[in-house]
């Protein structure tokens, strides 16, 4: 007997999608989540107060969307960086904007999300991704006439330290051992820092015990 074909529950699926859309609409927007009372330095939505270290930056610096709202096309293709990056790193650190989605319910369009390609300490990523911490008050726009000088960077060759001199006592012991064995080489003894994988002294015994426990395959 052929099995009866079960039709999908179209009404239940439609109801699930409607509930998901309602939940999405009821979620607070960025302009509500990250709204800030500049007198008390608290966020009205959560009631949390900003940390003391952020108070000075809130009054002097700007959020990312505050900068982009003043530019045509919200600054697509421009470079933005952060004050903390300028202080901490000598290498160029910046985002190149590829996409901006402002929150159109915000009064000055100064909230939203942005995407870009990150270059951190002179190394650029291959793909664009969403920019994090856009609500922080430490974003700065790189002027167009300074972009070429800001992005100029020559990577320095990495100096890998493969060996170091032995401590004085060990060095004296090695030289004495050479003299005892009749070795006349004058090469300075150096300690190799490269990792070499060495098997433990009981490795063969462990392998033999493991083979016995496993038994012979049938």
From Swiss-Prot:
The keyword Hydrolase does not apply. Coiled coil: none annotated. GO terms for biological process: mitochondrial translation. It is found in: Mitochondrion. Widely expressed (at protein liver). PANTHER family: 28S RIBOSOMAL PROTEIN S34, MITOCHONDRIAL (PTHR28589), SMALL RIBOSOMAL SUBUNIT PROTEIN MS34 (PTHR28589:SF1). Required for mitochondrial translation, plays a role in maintaining the stability of the small ribosomal subunit and the 12S rRNA that are required for mitoribosome formation. This is Small ribosomal subunit protein mS34. It comes from Mus musculus. The gene is Mrps34.
